[in-house]
Amino acid sequence: MELAPDDVLNVGTGIPNDVVGPIITEEGMSEDVTITVESGIYGGIPMGGIDFGIAKNQFALVRHDDQFDYYNGPGVDVTYMGAGEVDAQGNVNATCLGPKPTGAGGFIDITTNAKHVVFCSSFTAKGLDCSFEGGRLHINQEGSLIKFVNRIKQVSYNGKIAREKGQKMHYVTERAVFELQAEGLTLTEIAPGIDIQTQVLDLMEFTPRISPDLKEMDMAIFMEGAPFGLREYIFSN
């Protein structure tokens, strides 16, 4: 839902590329926003998985280094990136997951300069299994790995610096949405069917601020069938 008409988007590897890109196409918004990928792609449908970096039906392809000139411009309105760990200050680790560092790729350049950063992640990891029915989310098996932690292993994205720059930041999971505000990481939305205490707060190593205007995610997100009205929502807000 974090979109506006005519936005230029960047999608990173993982959930952003594999989910956000196809949803934009599925919802009929391909002509309303421009999707870019760090390899130099403009438009089209980004390919997922091991095919990250290529797309179908793109309208332009530029050199990799020229793409980063644009990103550092800054040219991106909204970037969608993955997140391995998040702390109470909104810092993100996306570069040191497990025993070996994975490297940053274009993550730092893009998240530093985009006007709005949306981190996309599952709430827990390692074994998480979810389903949805009738507009409600069901956690069939909880992940054993906590992702919202007191201390992240490596700072790939600095929430304090980003906030000082006036960047807009959201952290979106299947069951909860957070925003980095002046008071710290703030819970702003929760999925229908989710218990805030046992399925959110108890699975975090820190206690986030809870927005006094806490909302429920649109139940249409958790309904079978497509489209669910994203284009109409964007143009009416």
Q: How should each PLM-predicted stretch be described?
A:
Residues E2-N10, G184, F222, P227-L230:
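Glycine-rich phosphate/diphosphate-binding loops and the adjacent beta-loop-alpha structural elements
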Residues I45-P227:
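Conserved phosphate- and dinucleotide-binding cores of soluble alpha/beta proteins
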Residues I24-E27, E38, T207-S211, N237:
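Short, structured coil/loop segments at alpha-helix boundaries
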Residues G229-N237:
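Basic/polar N-terminal segments that are highly enriched at the extreme N-terminus
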